[in-house]
């Protein structure tokens, strides 16, 4: 990461991310989509445990995409949720997106900032189904006119190597 940003800018970006998280928790998916840049890359790969000796050599085992979505693909996912026919979300999940350890830095692109946060996504569904997703997110946000912001990239890294939930229909 490059140079750190001012406290004011850090605060503004953090507030944007907190607002975005609340939109997801409140199932305001269309409002959330409006926060995404047209060029959004929304990605998550499988987590693979690598041996220490391999990590020291810079060798990483191959991974598989879980998500590698564009804005159009995210819009289709949301449209499916809105139909009431997405059985993975009937009844709808109750979620809480918690983000912390927010680090913001400049990039080589004007008005684009790199953000690293740790997250905990709690998901409750039905009477007894509970899942915790924990990890790190690497986001890029773009500053527009009038201090508006758009999410340009989101790379989600799960700490869990095995996903124990029934599905991954929630948004991070």
UniProtKB/Swiss-Prot annotation:
GO MF term list: 3-phenylpropionate dioxygenase activity
EC number: 1.14.12.19
Keyword terms: Aromatic hydrocarbons catabolism, Dioxygenase, NAD, Oxidoreductase
Record field: catalytic activity: 3-phenylpropanoate + NADH + O2 + H(+) = 3-(cis-5,6-dihydroxycyclohexa-1,3-dien-1-yl)propanoate + NAD(+); (E)-cinnamate + NADH + O2 + H(+) = (2E)-3-(cis-5,6-dihydroxycyclohexa-1,3-dien-1-yl)prop-2-enoate + NAD(+)
Disulphide bond pairs: none
Coiled coil: none
CDD domains in alphabetical order: ring_hydroxylating_dioxygenases_beta
UniProt pathway: Aromatic compound metabolism; 3-phenylpropanoate degradation
Swiss-Prot/TrEMBL GO biological process terms: 3-phenylpropionate catabolic process
Function: Part of the multicomponent 3-phenylpropionate dioxygenase. Converts 3-phenylpropionic acid (PP) and cinnamic acid (CI) into 3-phenylpropionate-dihydrodiol (PP-dihydrodiol) and cinnamic acid-dihydrodiol (CI-dihydrodiol), respectively.
Complex formation: This dioxygenase system consists of four proteins: the two subunits of the hydroxylase component (HcaE and HcaF), a ferredoxin (HcaC) and a ferredoxin reductase (HcaD).
Listed name of the protein: 3-phenylpropionate/cinnamic acid dioxygenase subunit beta
Lineage: Bacteria, Pseudomonadati, Pseudomonadota, Gammaproteobacteria, Enterobacterales
Gene symbol of the encoding locus: hcaF
């Amino acid at each position: 990461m490059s140079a750190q940003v001012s406290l004011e800018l850090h605060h503004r970006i953090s507030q944007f991310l907190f607002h975005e998280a609340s939109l997801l928790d409140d199932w305001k998916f269309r409002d959330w989509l409006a926060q995404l840049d047209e060029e959004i890359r929304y990605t998550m790969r499988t987590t693979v445990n690598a041996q220490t000796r391999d990590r020291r050599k810079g060798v990483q085992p191959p991974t598989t995409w879980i998500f590698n979505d564009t804005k159009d693909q995210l819009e289709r996912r949301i449209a499916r949720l809105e139909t009431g026919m997405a059985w993975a979300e009937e009844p709808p999940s109750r979620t809480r997106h918690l983000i912390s350890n927010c680090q913001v830095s400049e990039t080589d692109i004007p008005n684009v900032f790199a953000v690293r946060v740790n997250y905990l996504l709690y998901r409750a569904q039905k009477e007894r189904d509970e899942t915790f997703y924990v990890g790190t997110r690497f986001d890029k946000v773009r500053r527009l006119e009038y201090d508006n912001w758009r999410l340009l990239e989101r790379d989600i890294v799960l700490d869990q190597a095995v996903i124990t939930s029934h599905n991954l229909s929630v948004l991070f």
